[in-house]
Amino acid sequence: MSKISYLQEREDMCKVAHYMWDRHLTNAAGGNFAVRVDEDRILISPSLMSERHFCELQPEDFLLINSNMDILEGTGKLSREGYMHVLLLTKFKNINATIHAHPMYCMVYVAQAKPIPNITEATMKRGPVECIPYTKAYTRNLHEEIYKYWEQRRELAETYPIGCIMPLHGVVVSGS
């Protein structure tokens, strides 16, 4: 294997992918995530991370991209949600990671397009996980709706992890 950049970050991302699967935070229907590793560098999980790999990834599986979504390292294909990850990671300087997933315990809310209320003191400061307007999956319109949701909560998003529900699809969360 040739030398790859950001090896420690990639190894950490392998653990996150494994945890996502093992803890039922996503399923074979999909899921993907990205981490900003430098000013104009983002590591992102490849397309079909869940469907083909069941989230068992190797460090070299992650793609290194720039803010134009050019693949700088890696041989895989970008996820259909790649633009959404890039949009949030480039427009919010305090957000360093984004995850799109299909968590088992959230999918009831997703299927009904219902917000997830706060139930613990620890989550009160973030507000509920609300729904964005229904938008067809894998489209720029969906990604723009997600960005609008974050923009409307900019101060909160720059301070705390937040998330939203994409009706009939899944969830998106961000954090530092």
Regions found by a protein language model. Name each.
Residues 1-176:
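Glycine-rich flexible loops
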